[in-house]
Amino acid sequence: MIETDIFIVGTGCSGLYCALNLPRDKQILMITKSDVRSSDSYLAQGGICVLKDESDYDSYFEDTLKAGHYENNKESVDIMIRTSQEVISDLIGYGVDFEHTTDGELAYTREGGHSDKRILFHEDETGEEITHTLLNRVLELPNVTILERTALIDIIEENNTCYGGVIKKEDGTIDTVAFRDDMVLACGGIGGLYKHSTNFRHLTGDGIAIAVKHGIERQDIDYIQIHPTTLYSDKPQDRSFLISESVRGEGAVLLDKNMERFTDELQPRDVVTAAIRKQMKLDGTEFVWEDLRTIPKDVVENHFPNIVEHCKQRGFDVYTEPIPVVPAQHYFMGGIKVDHNSATTMNNLYAVGETACNGVHGVNRLASNSLLESLVFAKRAAHKINADAVGLNAVPEPNWGERQAIVNKLFKPEDYADLSQIENDYRQMVLDEIDKFKEERGK
């Protein structure tokens, strides 16, 4: 048995930021299914939204709701927007290097669905810049232990209270984790379930499956975002390469097989995706074209160096020709149902990031709200855990010895003898849950 105060599953931006906002006198165990740099947070290209000033509040709020088809939780949206400046200040304090204008002011870009430029960025690798910086700050903390290539297999709970987890360690052995305070699920989305996805393949919705297994409430499981533009390939690949929405925000256009523009590129993602699929069907093609030559060359060079290089490796010169793009699964709006402090319906269990759903995105996420939402509500989870730890919201619970005894009593090694079967079962549980939500919604 591994003992800790707080157990965080996942080392993406939400898990890392949560850890940074927890007390330094708490022992924190973090695990990640792959290595610490293989989280989808690293893959976010476009940027992170921020409320530039109060005059932008109404339009930012409306843009978020419009993209979400007005099914968003309005309080969640308000919290996210109102907290954005605080989060950005934290990130800059940690050392995140956002782009600046020539006069030293923060530079903003625009993406689909936004009525104004309000997105901060670092070249076309904003997620990597943020997540790598947060990881470096976490690695400086003596109270945090990170175990790589360690997967959460199950939680240990009784009477709707979580006491620990079951993990598969790097050497393939099974162990248990018992925690004194709380557990945080920050284990990403479900892209690994799809043939074409921008996500890492190991992200298969383990947290969602565990929630289904233990009766933890879920929300909007069928709300799955398809990104309009990933680089087309006729060969099998680990994941689809994203062509950031900010490329279109800077002026790139979408073209049909006759090299004619066929849609407004700055509509919300689901609308642009539908337009592309319709055009592909009309043209009888497996992709449409995206032309970056409408953007000044210096902007492309400075803002999108990673995209330029990846396209070059694939045989495309974005300066002289359009590139083929196709929609692919990208983001999971649904998840484990949480309140505005990221608490699930099970005691001692929190969920943040793409694993969680507080309704902030509605049916369809507005571009560059994902990193922000993950950070805002991860910090709120940490603050709630802090408050509970000092007794501000204390609920009578078993003492540490009793908690350990409960974990030992409930853990049955024979239940985890066939891990490959468990993994397959979990995948099917998530897919079945998606179908169930669709049926209940009449889709």
Language model segments and positions:
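Glycine- and aromatic-enriched mobile tails/lids
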Residues: M1-T4, C13, N21, Q27, ...
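Glycine-rich active-site loop/strand segments that organize a redox cofactor
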Residues: C49-M80
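Short beta-strand to alpha-helix junction loop
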Residues: K74-Q85, R118-N136, L147, T198-G205, ...
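Glycine-rich loop(s) and the adjacent beta-strand/alpha-helix scaffold that form part
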Residues: D182-K235, F241, L371, L375
